[in-house]
């Protein structure tokens, strides 16, 4: 007896029926293109209407409403807007390669105009004498003190 009364009550409170009408196709057509330019009040109204429609079974929603609900929830607008526009990536890439080209060109020019003679401290004789001097002073006995650079 108690069990039958509980099951009858459960059957009566099963589904919630919200009295909402479908949004017009004119409201939802090209929503991603128009969304940014719409007034905030109209954006809020469309979002609220779609929220109410989503409380119904999803089979009652048409494709335009599903696409609009997805775009409002997850689309590329507001904080999800891409950081770079369509032509920005190519512009940045060209700028990076231009900067690298100028850098390498400037480096080559400086090397070309630099003194072609090597400094006297890069001479092998100088480096051997530096080794002898450091050995006489007992400099860095653990790690070594070799000043000779192999070529």
UniProtKB/Swiss-Prot annotation:
Mitochondrial matrix face residues: 18-85
Pfam families with a match to the protein in the record: COX4
Major localisation: mitochondrion
Keywords assigned: Membrane, Mitochondrion, Mitochondrion inner membrane, Oxidoreductase, Transit peptide, Transmembrane, Transmembrane helix
Presequence extent in this chain: 1-17
Record membrane topology: Single-pass membrane protein
Transmembrane segments: 86-108
Similarity field: Belongs to the cytochrome c oxidase IV family.
Quaternary assembly: Component of the cytochrome c oxidase (complex IV, CIV), a multisubunit enzyme composed of 12 subunits. The complex is composed of a catalytic core of 3 subunits COX1, COX2 and COX3, encoded in the mitochondrial DNA, and 9 supernumerary subunits COX4, COX5A (or COX5B), COX6, COX7, COX8, COX9, COX12, COX13 and COX26, which are encoded in the nuclear genome. COX5A is the predominant subunit V during aerobic/normoxic growth, it gets replaced by COX5B under anaerobic/hypoxic conditions.
Protein name, per record: Cytochrome c oxidase subunit 5B, mitochondrial
Gene: COX5B
